[in-house]
Amino acid sequence: MTSNITELNKWIEGYVNPQSEESVKTNAINMVLLYMKSNKIDLQDVVQGLGDYLKSNDSILRARGTLLLSEVLCRLPDLPLNQDQVHFLAMFYCDRLQDYACSSEVVKGITGLITNHTPDYPDNQKLLRNIFSEVHPTSLTQAHRKMVLQVIDIMFNKCLSEIQELKNDFMVGYLQFIDNEKDPRNLIFSFKLLPKVIYNIPEHKHFLESLFEIISCYFPISFNPKGNDPNSITKDDLSNSLLNCFSCTPLLAEHSIPFLIDKICSNLIETKIEALQTLVYCCDRYGGFAVQPFLEEIWSTLRTLILTHKNTTVIEESKKTIFYLTRSFTKERKVLESFLSIMIKECLHHIKSSQDSKIAIYCASILYQSVSASLLSSKIILIHIFPNLFNFLSELQKQDTVQKVNEQNSVIALFNDLLKANSIAFEMYSNENKEPNPLEPFVDQLFKLFSDLLLLNSSSSIRSNSIECLSNLYISKKVHTTEQDDDDSEQITNEFLLDLEKRQFIIKSLVSLLNSSDNTLRHKSLDSLFTIASNEDPSVLNLYVIPTLLQMINHSSCNINTTNNKINNNNNNNNIVIKNNKCQDEHCNEDHSNKNENNNNSNENSNGNSTSGSDDDLKHYLEAFTKLCTHQPLLESVIPQIQVLLQHNIKETYQSNEDFEKSILILQSISFILEKSTNIKSMTICSKSILFPLIKGLYKQELISSSNDNNNNNNNNSNRFNQILTPTLKMIHSIFENISIESQKPLLEKLIKLFLNGDTLVINYQLPTTTTTIIKPFEKSSPYKYLIPIFTTIISQSKLDLSENNELKQSLYQMSLDVNVDDSIAISCSKAYSSIINKQQQQQQQDQINFNFFNDNLLKVINDTTTPLPLKIRHLDLFTWCTKALLTNGNSINIKLGSCLADIISNENVELSYHASKSFGILLSETDVLNEKSGSIIKILFEQKFFTLMFPILLESFKVSKNKELQTISSHYLIAISNLLKHVPKEILLAELNEILPIVMQSLKSSDNNDQVQLLDSSLQTLTMLINETPSSFISYLDSLIPSLIKISTKSTKYNLKRSALEILTLLSKSIPFVNLFPYKTQVVTDIIPCLDDKKRIVRREAQKCRNSWYILQK
């Protein structure tokens, strides 16, 4: 024991002695702590050892001695101390606080004592009193000032009642310690502590003014943290903590609100914005009654900002402030009514007296924000505003309508804004209080007003605004309360404010405007119908809108056919085409007798314009039908009508070219509708009701075009079939892509029978007696090969594994290599074949698909010098798509196949080499097949993996061909590389920057002939991205880059290349330092002058921007 004491004294001497080295001090304190931890010495031993030092006349020795004791208390949280020892230490520190030289060390000791132990009453009070009375905050370092705050915080948690007994003394001492604090670490702690003080010390109300003076000096927070410290305190941290201080008690409202209003009037935009946001937060926390005395002052300030300020950000923030304040005041109705009464009175005054002015528009926006804030605010405002607006509009209508159109429009626009705002409020808050819609008392008056304006007013702008008002009134709902039968509880159901009759009137009025000569009215009507369709039950629209549109579409079609027949027959006997009052179109039952009587005399004069007019009508109706049917619930209900449209427009014969063009327009519209739908339910219905009739119609078309003996007619029919095929393939693609694998399976089984076995009964089609052969499109001599894309589209979108169907695979394989079919057919077969390969099971794929398969069947033919070029191209296309299939599903041979594709680029045949280089664009690009929607297997990051392994191979081949001076081959390798660069993420490009930049720079020197356009375009795109990401990397290339870009912008024959080059020059002027660009300034400004006279406006505009940017270059 004696030896331990001896060692202890030695360590105390080493620690306390100011002459000791830091290593000695560190070792000494560590050994003291170690011995105490192992119970070889105790606290009493340490105190006795420190006795002489604590009594020393040397302030440094006293401080070091005190620090040693404090370190022990802080660093040994589990140190066993009884209450006598705790009391002794508390009294020791109370006494030692009078020693100014030891204040920091004592504060640390008190922190350790309070944190790890609990002194008895009233030791905590004595410690805190002595800290407040003896310690001056300015004498402490940041860390020790924070310790004082931590001591207060701990005492609040451990002995709150003792702290509360201090009353005013605590508040005086606490304010002393937080005043004039500047360190952000202490500030954030004091800000977080303040609400706790407010909540727990009732005497704070006597010190509110002093308290607010202390915290308000920090607003707004201006603090920039160190950028290299991720754990540093941020400006937002300080701002949020200060915000909680401002709002911690309603008693601060009398100080904070005038202060914030003063800050809102600041000249600094940032200060205004932050003050507005703080005002909203504080008012919400204070409650309406605390804010009520300041309502007029708040409104006056916000009104001034909105009506007079020039900065849009400030104006929008002020509007948001009104919205949130109104929502907050909803909790106290009297306060809300007081606030809104001030606002309504002034807004109405400006609206009536300042019509067609910016002030009136801003007042309308203020009302919009207030109405949308809550259901109660909407009710209060609408009750006061609507009667005034009705009277005011009536007065305007009695005056000269021509001069007052703008004023009327402003009032109608305000009606519309209020309807929208009320809908927002009702949708957000109606279910909370089960209150009726505030519009309910005015609904009949509003309906009559807007209906009369639409039907009776001659102003297009007023009618347009009234259309939007009617649609917003239409979708406004009410809350209908009914009782449930089981437990008598109330059930809330939403119903429209307008009854069905009024809603049907609006629908009919809007439909009647769909063919208006006024584009604004037509588009506004269509948009309003779509808005209604998004809210209304589809059955209501199916009562009138859809049947009417379909009737109009068919009627427009009939007009086209009728007009053409009249033109054709007019020179013969001037017979009228309508017989028995029925249209000659076999699919139309329209009665045209009235039209015939009225228009018979005018046909001779109007024949030249009627066709184009009917064509425009048809486009307008189709536009409406298409937009409405993109709404999913409505689409499901109109699928039968779409089926009828398809049957009527994929006909065996067309009466004229105009009739055919009309059918194409309808098919394109249906195609657009189905493309926009991704709903499985809707597409499943389409697959059952539309798919097979659609294919049947296409079969009939192809049968007609293939069986016609007349060459001219045959070519015409073939062209028509191809035009029909384009939109119908998109329909088939959309349907099959969006149905489940369970729905696909039975359909595929039937379609394989149809296309491979010629079983047309699958589509319920009996071949004509004149057809002696079975329709098998995949037979070598079949004249029906144009049907193949239908089948390949389906196979490509199939989610099933079809790899076991060898007949299917062989048919696709052979057709993809057939040089006697169109390229589009062969490519579609290659896509379908690759899709099957992609979806094979991995083990089966390894067994059936290996490198030898491709080498023996495709590569040998491609590399054989005796093979005709068209056949090589076919094999190369199939090889490319198969490579893409195996690349996307992560097959291990994909890199080997890619290397073979790269080798083909070095082929002596220039056309084959160029085709191979373009193939690299297919490998990584997004296509309509081999994607996730089609059920393909897509491995994660396959693009990055392929680029990482393939780029070095292509780069090395490019260097070899360049060294051998094979200019054409090297340019083809550049095309392949550029195609890779175009489709990989920028992170990958940046990682290979040193290798990529020389390649891109080399590519810019290519000519813009047909073979090189793709290379230049891709290189310019890559260049733009790289300059945006790492502009400094191009400084060393400026001497070659800038002349190359100038040459492209002035000499290229492709306007898109010119524009891209000019955009890059502009980008360089903004991204590269002035000192590097200045030597080229004159060259750029002078040499791009020819672009200012370019025949393309887009080039001229970009040249002007580029020249201006370079002309004003400055340091």
From Swiss-Prot:
Family matches, as InterPro entries: ARM-like, ARM-type_fold, MMS19, MMS19_C, MMS19_N
Ranges: HEAT repeats: 944-986, 990-1032, 1035-1075, 1078-1115
Compositional bias per record (Low complexity), positions renumbered to this chain: 596-613
Keyword Cytoplasm appears in the UniProt entry: yes
One example of a Gene Ontology biological process annotation: protein maturation
Gene3D superfamilies according to UniProt: Leucine-rich Repeat Variant
Superkingdom per UniProt: Eukaryota
Entry's Gene Ontology cellular component terms: cytoplasm; cytosol; cytosolic [4Fe-4S] assembly targeting complex; nucleus
Region Disordered: start-end pairs: 587-615
Alphabetical keyword list: Cytoplasm, DNA damage, DNA repair, Nucleus, Repeat, Transcription
Statement: the UniProt record of this protein carries the keyword Cell inner membrane: no
Location in or out of the cell: Nucleus; Cytoplasm
Similarity comment: Belongs to the MET18/MMS19 family.
Subunit structure, as described in the record: Component of the CIA complex.
Biological role stated in the UniProt entry: Key component of the cytosolic iron-sulfur protein assembly (CIA) complex, a multiprotein complex that mediates the incorporation of iron-sulfur cluster into apoproteins specifically involved in DNA metabolism and genomic integrity. In the CIA complex, MMS19 acts as an adapter between early-acting CIA components and a subset of cellular target iron-sulfur proteins.
Record protein name field: MMS19 nucleotide excision repair protein homolog
Organism field: Dictyostelium discoideum (Social amoeba)
